[in-house]
Amino acid sequence: MNTVRVTFLLVFVLAVSLGQADKDENRMEMQEKTEQGKSYLDFAENLLLQKLEELEAKLLEEDSEESRNSRQKRCIGEGVPCDENDPRCCSGLVCLKPTLHGIWYKSHYCYKK
């Protein structure tokens, strides 16, 4: 019975002395882990920022392309009277004198090219 107590006490002392880590070591390990976590967070943050900047650049390009390729907002259609000095005929149309000239016609109309 004595040997059991001594053995138990010996195992207990060894477990406490070897199993318990130093407080400074724990603090250092925690600091290293938080620094690594911060570096990972900074890396992820920079990566996300780059992706957002790329998306923003693409969106701005699409907006500028839409404004360049947008259709004419106000133009005169085919067979509509136009002014010879300031023709506002739609693309593909030209401001010309009509072939049949009567008194009810104005001087120029928009016709296909």
UniProtKB/Swiss-Prot annotation:
InterPro entries: Toxin_22 (IPR012627). Its main location: secreted. One of its GO terms (cellular component) is extracellular region. Residues 22-74 form a propeptide. Residues 60-83 are annotated as: Disordered. Residues 60-69 have a biased composition (Basic and acidic residues). Residues 1-21 form the signal peptide. GO terms for molecular function: sodium channel inhibitor activity; toxin activity. Keywords: Disulfide bond, Ion channel impairing toxin, Knottin, Secreted, Signal, Toxin. Transmembrane segments: none annotated. Disulfide bonds join C75-C90, C82-C95, C89-C110. It is found in: Secreted. It comes from the Eukaryota. Expressed by the venom gland. The presence of a 'disulfide through disulfide knot' structurally defines this protein as a knottin. Belongs to the neurotoxin 14 (magi-1) family. 01 (HNTX-16) subfamily. Probable ion channel inhibitor. This is U11-theraphotoxin-Hhn1j. It comes from Cyriopagopus hainanus (Chinese bird spider).
